[in-house]
Amino acid sequence: MPRFESKGLCDQLRRAVVSIPSNIAEGAGRSSTLEFSHFLDIAKGSCNEIDTQILIAKNIGYIDEGYYNTLLHKIQHVSSQLYKLIKTVRTE
């Protein structure tokens, strides 16, 4: 991405990426499954945010279709794993 985006889209993307494991860790340290589930939902929301941000990056020409598809596949995999974890935690 262009250097001038280091404070824009890149920064937003970086925060969303860091948010996923951070929220999982914070939720795991909470005292109830309800709280854990809440933080997993936040992490899942960050996956959706990343999905949107990489689409924007592709649409404005910062990344090509191939790299977009690679990133999309990875974030969809993370999102799917989180969804399964959320279902498991909520049935406990």
Residue spans for each PLM region:
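Amphipathic alpha-helical assembly/interaction segments
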Residues: M1-E92
